[in-house]
Amino acid sequence: MFENIYIQQRIEKANKLREDGINPYSNESSRNCTISKYLNVNSDIFQLEEKRDENRNYTVAGRIKFFRLMGKASFLKIEDESGMLQIYVARDNLPENFYNEVFKKNIEVGDIIEISGYPFVTGHGELSLHADSLKILTKAISPLPEKFHGIQDKELRYRQRYLDLIMNSEVRKTFHIRSKVISLTRRFFENKGFLEVETPMMHPIAGGANAKPFVTHFNALGVDRFLRIAPELYLKRLIVGGFEAVFEINRNFRNEGMDATHNPEFTSIEFYWAYKTYKDLIVLTKEYFEYLFENLNLPTILPYGEFKIDFNKFSEIPLIQSLYEIGGVPQDIVEDKDKILAFLKANNLEANANLNLGQLQGELFDEFVEAKLINPTFITEYPVEISPLARRSDEKPHLTDRFELFIAGKEIANAFSELNDPIDQLQRFEGQIAAKEAGDDEAHEMDEDFVNALSYGMAPTAGQGIGIDRLVMMLTNEHSIRDVLLFPAMKPIKQEIDLYSEEK
């Protein structure tokens, strides 16, 4: 594994440190200041006449990102999570022979070191640290990529995220924002009186959304289990039990394709609110975005690729209406199954003739409308046939009290007034079974226990899911879901395939 000549040279240096009585993997650090704090508390040095203060002493630590070795003195740049700092190392300020025998011969870019010293400003006007002592904390035996400003190979970045994080500070910034989004999301719902809960990750029935599940086996019980597609049915059981506002932030798993907006495991928040409707959730969603933007200090008009997304403008339009007003689909065909099939065929699009009208309307939306929804848009009134868990509209029984929120052509949220009629729910599940038999692999399974829960009475409730990954993509101007996941799913490399074959 470590046959590379450059790695071998670094291993030799680590061994030389050991021979000199220096542990190249020390477990003790005396750091008392992060780099950002050092730069902040010493900003007044620029105002001092001598541009230095030898009475101050700080100990910082970080990875060497740049090394300019000179005769009796050297300049380094080290980086910790908070920032980068220039270090001045002079031979005569270190213990005898340390500079020539240890520092110059065995320390290099990539190593993690600890330095103590005082602040000063260089002749070029850069606040730096004048080293009085230096200690190696971790010897890196693999050299960093040559490019100081990072690695450009995306495949390598995703497979070796640790290396990507070392080399690209902007990547670290993205994941700081992601973490803050999750933290703010939790705080927003807690402030609204919601209770955070945890529900099972392994389900006896693949349910909660229309998707293909991952299957595993529970050895102790001798039964198969499904990694959860969505937590919806368990959260609604809690509403039946008497909790009136619950949320869960966690992973979901869908055994489907990967692309710029889909990863087999992803993070979402789902929340359910008793005595509310989907219209209340539209208001809540707007408040949520306002809260995020305020606390992230983001402008309300954000660039996203070629677009500028205006988060001051949330529009709302029924799905059927969007087909002809936004998608350009002829208005006279949108309620006729045969005409839709002919229209799809005329546009060189495949359509299963076994699909019902609502499913075909969904196909039209996916093909002709979704990508055009740039500014935040609530698409409402989805057909019953593609909304097996949503409540029927009282005014239009063939439609549901549902919305999906789209931004930059991507679905960000899905919400509806919940179906709480157990008989209607049973019939919907039976319809989904028929759809599965007709070839719909993603149709919902029958869940008799959930129907039984509804039979005890569930208060009028509205529920919603928001995809955290896609939301972070919008907020950070990233165009692949892999760029907002620390460790995205990747195709196995040849060694992994060979190892798996041997184990089998």
UniProtKB/Swiss-Prot annotation:
Gene Ontology biological-process entries: lysyl-tRNA aminoacylation
Disulfide bonds: none
Free-text comment on the cofactor: Binds 3 Mg(2+) ions per subunit.
A molecular function (GO) term: tRNA binding
Keywords, in A-Z order: Aminoacyl-tRNA synthetase, ATP-binding, Cytoplasm, Ligase, Magnesium, Metal-binding, Nucleotide-binding, Protein biosynthesis
Broad class of the protein's primary localization: cytoplasm
Subcellular location, record wording: Cytoplasm
Pfam families reported for this sequence: tRNA-synt_2 (PF00152), tRNA_anti-codon (PF01336)
Reactions this protein catalyses: tRNA(Lys) + L-lysine + ATP = L-lysyl-tRNA(Lys) + AMP + diphosphate
SUPFAM superfamilies linked to this entry: Class II aaRS and biotin synthetases, Nucleic acid-binding proteins
Gene Ontology CC entries for this record: cytosol
InterPro entries per record: Aa-tRNA-synt_II, aa-tRNA-synth_II, aa-tRNA-synth_II/BPL/LPL, Lys-tRNA-ligase_II, Lys-tRNA-ligase_II_N, Lys-tRNA-synth_II_C, NA-bd_OB-fold, NA-bd_OB_tRNA
NCBIfam families from the UniProt entry: lysS_bact, PRK00484.1
PANTHER family (alphabetical): LYSINE--TRNA LIGASE, CHLOROPLASTIC_MITOCHONDRIAL (PTHR42918:SF15), LYSYL-TRNA SYNTHETASE (PTHR42918)
Subunit structure, as described in the record: Homodimer.
Family: Belongs to the class-II aminoacyl-tRNA synthetase family.
Protein name in the entry: Lysine--tRNA ligase
Organism name: Aliarcobacter butzleri (strain RM4018)
